[in-house]
UniProtKB/Swiss-Prot annotation:
<keyword id="KW-0689">Ribosomal protein</keyword>
<dbReference type="InterPro" id="IPR000473">
    <property type="entry name" value="Ribosomal_bL36"/>
</dbReference>
<dbReference type="GO" id="GO:1990904">
    <property type="term" value="C:ribonucleoprotein complex"/>
</dbReference>
<dbReference type="InterPro" id="IPR047621">
    <property type="entry name" value="Ribosomal_L36_bact"/>
</dbReference>
<dbReference type="GO" id="GO:0005840">
    <property type="term" value="C:ribosome"/>
</dbReference>
<protein>
    <recommendedName>
        <fullName>Large ribosomal subunit protein bL36</fullName>
    </recommendedName>
</protein>
<dbReference type="InterPro" id="IPR035977">
    <property type="entry name" value="Ribosomal_bL36_sp"/>
</dbReference>
<dbReference type="GO" id="GO:0006412">
    <property type="term" value="P:translation"/>
</dbReference>
<dbReference type="GO" id="GO:0003735">
    <property type="term" value="F:structural constituent of ribosome"/>
</dbReference>
<dbReference type="Pfam" id="PF00444">
    <property type="entry name" value="Ribosomal_L36"/>
</dbReference>
<keyword id="KW-0687">Ribonucleoprotein</keyword>
<comment type="similarity">
    <text>Belongs to the bacterial ribosomal protein bL36 family.</text>
</comment>
């Protein structure tokens, strides 16, 4: 999982990326291709 300050550019890397908020943190999840996972940090 990548840790990035800004997730906007990471969201554009794959069309199936979803931006979700869990426990006050923003995550990028991708069910089809899990290597695009990221967390804002």
């Amino acid at each position: 999982m990548k840790i990035k300050n800004s997730l906007k550019s990471l969201k554009a890397r794959h069309r199936d990326n979803r931006l979700v908020r869990r426990k006050g943190r923003m995550y990028i999840i991708n069910k089809l291709n899990p290597r695009f996972k990221a967390r804002q940090g």
